[in-house]
Amino acid sequence: MKIITCYKCVPDEQDIAVNNADGSLDFSKADAKISQYDLNAIEAACQLKQQAAEAQVTALSVGGKALTNAKGRKDVLSRGPDELIVVIDDQFEQALPQQTASVLAAAAQKAGFDLILCGDGSSDLYAQQVGLLVGEILNIPAVNGVSKIISLTADTLTVERELEDETETLSIPLPAVVAVSTDINSPQIPSMKAILGAAKKPVQVWSAADIGFNAEAAWSEQQVAAPKQRERQRIVIEGDGEEQIAAFAENLRKVI
């Protein structure tokens, strides 16, 4: 059983600065980290490994220079995967969901897999598209919002997901792609033994050419900016008479 767990390196949100002049975001001082939602996918994959005989877990990521960071690689491997594959290319530095999914699908085909796990979305964009797009590209079943994995056999994965007013149980034929929600588990903090052992695990570095990926016309991101902030007027209207109500209504009209 070959399980691939996908993850994304994202900027640490606490280090992102806002340029007051135009509202643009400054990522220059933000360190990269594993997307919080993908930590759940990594944990789920490693829990499945304990259930399936001879299962192997491969962590897979696509991106730019952030994936060259040795500390980041060690962090991923310390959480349980047996090996790591990173696909690094400058064109993937700010990849949007369609391109990311295309590269992940190509890399997964090259590596071989029975099951692909990923988080429902990423901590930065949270587009909630990549998992379903990977399934579409590979022409295999894809399910998102999975909150529980019930069982895994050689050819079927049984899962649950919470809908608005019911719990849905699904049996998914393998191979398949499953995007998990944060309800599925609580990611463990790696032990010192796991951290030290991570340095001995294999890491494969692939380029776009290695997976046969040709640059495609992708949607381009036009702008990422913080919302404009309005200065508060600090208008306080005291009382509940007709004059105060009229004044309140008049001020509402000015901002609507």
Swiss-Prot record:
GO terms for molecular function: electron transfer activity. The keyword Transport applies. It comes from Escherichia coli O45:K1 (strain S88 / ExPEC). One of its GO terms (biological process) is carnitine metabolic process. This is Protein FixA. SMART domains: ETF. Gene3D superfamilies: HUPs (3.40.50.620). SUPFAM superfamilies: Adenine nucleotide alpha hydrolases-like. Coiled coil: none annotated. Keywords: Electron transport, Transport. Heterodimer of FixA and FixB. Required for anaerobic carnitine reduction. May bring reductant to CaiA. Pathway: Amine and polyamine metabolism; carnitine metabolism. Belongs to the ETF beta-subunit/FixA family. CDD domains: ETF_beta. Pfam families: ETF (PF01012).
